[in-house]
């Protein structure tokens, strides 16, 4: 059952835990008999009374509770019938009073609580439940309480389940409150407070069949504001409370006199039971809250520890990633430097090889020098005329001096060592007609102080200087 109230589920859990203490067999039987979604209300009510009788035969002390005690919603808002009408409709108490030997198994129940079913079902249920209980010779307590009132359907609905407050709740669900009857509630419920003004009915069990009678009460000047707990040798028993505005409680004085005469422990323990139960409940709630707070603190610490571990792992991962990236950049720079160095070295080797290929071989003279020398030798054999010499001199003056292309590099210091470069005082050896190969070689050796190098260039003298 699910109700909008927040604390309803907790109360349901407590009630189920109390049911399980009565034994597995009783729990299974209760589940089979009192299915909240049952459609057969007549059979369910008949089985309800039979089940209560069977529990009493087995030694249990079932206590019928209101739905508000179990599920949390308050049924005290219903308007109970007036006391005058109840007194007029109630049967003769002397005819329904049980023997005096059954005071220990007697239990008190509010009048509004006994009407667990709507009023329109009372007539059919009375006929259907009578043959089902013939074996136990038992009177249907629920129907007996309903027979006391012959009011209209509206009055019956007001006394019974508040259908206007919970329209979606099926009426048969109210029968499931009897599951709470195996073990009574440990603490009094607030819905049993001063709102309830109806007279309480006392259900007693003896060797004879179940009977319905009014409970005995004190005078009008002593209303009971709280519901104490009655403790017997078989277990605790929940007693209902009356509001401060309730009227006198009618019933047979024989029961109360018997209790006073026998000195039952319920009379002596009635005063401090409610306060003790309330303190116990408050202490239990405080312990539960403290335990929940400790659990929440433990969960928070665990979450903080996990978050710290995740942050630490993330920082270590970022640090490792940065370190790997720096190592990768360093390795890449190292590779690039080695590649550039190798490239420069290869380029220098290629340039050196190219220069070696372009330089002349042999005696170190340009190729055109031998031809010029042979030409000059041929001219020496044929003496020039005066007119030819004058003409060649004039042409030489008119023409600008020609720039001879250098076959080697511009600076011979690039191919010579620092010590050898200092010995080089001239860049070229000037020759004329009278210069021979031996003279040129000797001049070069004097300049370089080494063997002849291909860097030395031969430059012929101008024609006019040779005259």
From Swiss-Prot:
**What are the Basic and acidic residues biased-composition ranges?**
392-401
Note the coiled coil stretches, chain numbering.
279-359
The lineage's top-level taxon is Eukaryota
The answer on whether this UniProt entry bears the keyword Translocase reads no
Per UniProt, the ranges with Polar residues bias are: 253-265
- Which UniProt key words apply to this protein? Coiled coil, Phosphoprotein
* Biased composition annotated in UniProt, kind: Basic residues: 349-380
Q: Where in the sequence is Phosphoserine found?
A: 129
Q: Where is this region: Disordered?
A: 81-105, 211-280, 349-416
> Pfam families, from UniProt?
CCDC71L
Return the Low complexity bias intervals.
88-105
Q: What's the protein called, per UniProt? A: Coiled-coil domain-containing protein 71
Q: In the UniProt record, what gene is named as encoding this protein?
A: CCDC71
């Amino acid at each position: 059952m699910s109700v909008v109230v927040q604390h309803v589920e907790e109360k349901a859990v407590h009630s189920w835990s109390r049911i399980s203490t009565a034994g597995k067999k009783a729990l299974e039987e209760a589940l089979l008999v009192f299915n909240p979604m049952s459609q057969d209300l007549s059979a369910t009510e008949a089985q309800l009374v039979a089940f209560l009788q069977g529990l009493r035969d087995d030694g249990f002390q079932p206590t019928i509770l209101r739905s508000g005690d179990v599920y949390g919603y308050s049924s005290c808002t219903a308007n109970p019938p007036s006391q005058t009408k109840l007194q007029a409709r109630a049967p003769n108490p002397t005819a329904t009073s049980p023997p005096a030997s059954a005071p220990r198994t007697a239990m008190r129940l509010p009048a509004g609580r006994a009407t667990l079913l709507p009023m329109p079902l009372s007539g059919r249920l009375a006929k259907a439940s009578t043959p089902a209980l013939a074996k136990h010779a038992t009177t249907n307590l629920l129907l007996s309480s309903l027979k006391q009132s012959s009011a209209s359907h509206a009055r019956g609905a007001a006394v019974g389940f508040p259908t206007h407050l919970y329209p979606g709740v099926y009426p048969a669900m109210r029968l499931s409150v009897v599951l709470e009857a195996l073990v009574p509630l440990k603490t009094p419920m607030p819905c049993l407070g001063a709102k309830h003004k109806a007279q309480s009915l006392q259900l007693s069990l003896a060797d004879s069949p179940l009977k319905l009678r009014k409970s005995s009460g004190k005078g009008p000047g002593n209303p009971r504001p709280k519901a104490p707990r009655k403790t017997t040798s078989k277990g605790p028993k929940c007693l209902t409370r009356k509001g401060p505005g309730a009227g006198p409680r009618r019933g047979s004085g024989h029961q109360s006199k018997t209790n006073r005469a026998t000195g039952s422990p319920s009379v002596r323990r009635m005063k401090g039971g409610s306060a003790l139960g309330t303190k116990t409940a408050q202490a239990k709630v405080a312990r539960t809250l403290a335990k929940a707070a400790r659990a929440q603190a433990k969960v928070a610490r665990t979450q903080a520890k996990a978050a710290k571990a995740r942050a630490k792992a993330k920082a270590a991962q970022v640090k490792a990633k940065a370190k790997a990236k720096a190592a990768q950049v360093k390795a890449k720079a190292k590779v690039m430097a080695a590649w550039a160095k190798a490239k420069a070295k290869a380029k220098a080797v290629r340039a050196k090889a190219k220069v070696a290929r372009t330089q002349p071989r042999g005696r170190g003279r340009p190729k055109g020098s031998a031809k010029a020398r042979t030409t000059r030798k041929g001219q020496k054999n044929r003496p020039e005329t005066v007119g030819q010499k004058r003409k060649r001199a004039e042409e030489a003056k008119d023409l600008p001096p020609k720039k001879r292309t250098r076959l080697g590099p511009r600076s011979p210091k690039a191919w010579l060592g620092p010590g050898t470069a200092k010995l080089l005082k001239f860049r070229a050896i000037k020759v004329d007609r009278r210069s021979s190969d031996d003279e040129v070689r000797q001049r070069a050796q004097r300049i370089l102080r080494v063997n002849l190098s291909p860097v030395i260039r031969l430059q012929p003298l101008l024609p006019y200087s040779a005259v």
